[in-house]
Amino acid sequence: MRTHYCNGIHEGLIGQTVTLCGWAQRRRDHGGVIFIDLRDREGLVQIVADPDQVDAFAAANECRSEFVLQVEGVLRARPAGTENPHMPSGKVELAAARIRILNRSEPVPFPLDEEDIAENLRLKYRYLDLRRPEMLHRLRLRHQVTRFVRGYLDNAGFIDVETPVLTRSTPEGARDYLVPSRTQPGHFFALPQSPQLFKQLLMVAGLDRYYQITKCFRDEDLRADRQPEFTQIDIEASFVDEEAVMGTAEPMIRGLFAEVLGVQLPDPFPRMTYRDAMHRFGVDRPDLRNPLELTELTDLMRAVDFKVFREAAERPHGRVACLRVPGGAQLSRAQIDAYTQFTAIYGARGLAWIKVNALDQGNEGLQSPIVKFLPEMVLSEILRRSGAAAGDILFFGADTAKIVNEALGNLRNRVAADLGLLEGEWCPVWITDFPMFDYDDKEDRWTSTHHPFTAPQTEHLETLGQDPGNALARAYDLVLNGNEIGGGSIRIHQEAVQEKVFAALGIGAEEARDKFGFLLDALHYGAPPHGGLAFGLDRLVMLLCGAETIRDVIAFPKTQKAGCLLTEAPGTVADKQLQELGIRLRPGVGGGVPNP
């Protein structure tokens, strides 16, 4: 139906007859001559319909925005002075000899050339939103990423293997999406949160090197960087250690950025332990473009009279720290109050601060409600440790280490963004030596920091049961500009070690056998040492194209309420379907009457 895409139209084709297909982006009637900007996936071309081409002119006169057209004509140079330097085809135009209206369009609910469009409207009419060049660019960039990744891993000897989408429910840290079985009433499949167990079984099977670009599903509360279904670049290999896994993944990411953006990332990527990241930045995914760091003050505050600081410093897992903001003394009280409210989101019960107006005037050079509660010697040491200078402000956190880290760590990011402190464009970093376990105060038990199949570091094997809080994992995350883009670990390949980890998590032998019996059985048959990692494709593409959320790089995303505005999913189903599945709805569930 066509001879060229719009981006294939250029001066070298002047005088030739070409046929284009696409959508009418804009129609203009200039004194009897009609101009149409024809758009396809690749670009725009200006169509000119002259009155002497009667049929073509009549069709152009009838044409409206987003009509689907086939246009045949002779390419010619635009008249001098009418060229458009902002279009690749801006020096030429197509003189229409024939215009065929392939389909008509109702007026669209929003102008496709506008940028400020309500997201709900965009998601409801996603098929129109995707016509916009910006969205087409993002989907093409996503394709470019997956094509590069497949080529890299293929060349590295990895084999693409699909794993099941219908599997059994296993605890992996988030709620499963359950699928009831019609043939086995009362039983359920689960949609996989990751291919974790199956890729380990592929290593037991001797596949040696596996990868997959696959959908994963998690029924969890959503944020800007989460979706109930998301895509993962999943990688696993046998006979590897941490260095080998990172040594495979790092060149892939470095090559990807060079291929897609023409950017040279550092070689090698810097590394940082989890402990160091939390101590310096308060988070395990630090944005290293941000020059701000936390300063440790816990030891200083154990003997002060200021109760808020002293009690936090004396508690077993307490912390007192400060965040120095250069030039922050200019912040208004309203801005400080806004930051106080921001840290409250993370559990902080207040945000103490000191403005440093002058360093050579002792306490007189400091402005703060808390200065009078702290000895001059302590204040002097705070200024020394933090490297404070005149014109700075110090923000303080005093509570459990968890609350202080989350509050000041996130405040660090917020302040840097507000004040334009970010330096550089791309700053990757590997975070290593994660704790094996986190303590869940609500459930009063240890939980896996990553997942229960992560191997502990060798020196902690014997003390897992007695001292789980100090055990470190053979785990690693890759962080880019404050975003965790990938993570993985060396896996447990010996049943005795797996049983120790289950025991530390409070998973007894019977429960382990019930939930993971197939994995434990596989470990009997010569499982090789193995490990891997996974990258979040959606988040990676979001960063590469500068989008604000991963919803902007997924063709048909869900909302933050896990719904689809386009299809209105999730939806209700017929009573007959529920009866076949042996499901009865509670009264009031789903907005209807439960089936009999």
UniProtKB/Swiss-Prot annotation:
Its EC number is 6.1.1.23. CDD domains: AspRS_core (cd00777), EcAspRS_like_N (cd04317). It holds the Pfam family tRNA_anti-codon. The record marks H30, G81 as: Important for tRNA non-discrimination. One of its GO terms (molecular function) is nucleic acid binding. Keywords: Aminoacyl-tRNA synthetase, ATP-binding, Cytoplasm, Ligase, Nucleotide-binding, Protein biosynthesis. ATP binds at R218, D219, E220, Q227, E484, G536, L537, D538, R539. Residues 196-199 are annotated as: Aspartate. PROSITE patterns: AA_TRNA_LIGASE_II. The keyword Transcription does not apply. GO terms for biological process: aspartyl-tRNA aminoacylation. L-aspartate binds at E172, R218, H450, R491. It is an enzyme of class 6 (ligase). It is found in: Cytoplasm. The keyword Ligase applies. InterPro entries: Aa-tRNA-synt_II, aa-tRNA-synth_II, aa-tRNA-synth_II/BPL/LPL, Asp-tRNA-ligase_1, Asp-tRNA-ligase_1_N, Asp/Asn-tRNA-synth_IIb, AspRS_core, GAD-like_sf. It catalyses: tRNA(Asx) + L-aspartate + ATP = L-aspartyl-tRNA(Asx) + AMP + diphosphate. It comes from the Bacteria. One of its GO terms (cellular component) is cytoplasm. Homodimer. NCBIfam families: aspS_bact, PRK00476.1. Aspartyl-tRNA synthetase with relaxed tRNA specificity since it is able to aspartylate not only its cognate tRNA(Asp) but also tRNA(Asn). Reaction proceeds in two steps: L-aspartate is first activated by ATP to form Asp-AMP and then transferred to the acceptor end of tRNA(Asp/Asn). Belongs to the class-II aminoacyl-tRNA synthetase family. Type 1 subfamily. This is Aspartate--tRNA(Asp/Asn) ligase. It comes from Acidithiobacillus ferrooxidans (strain ATCC 23270 / DSM 14882 / CIP 104768 / NCIMB 8455).
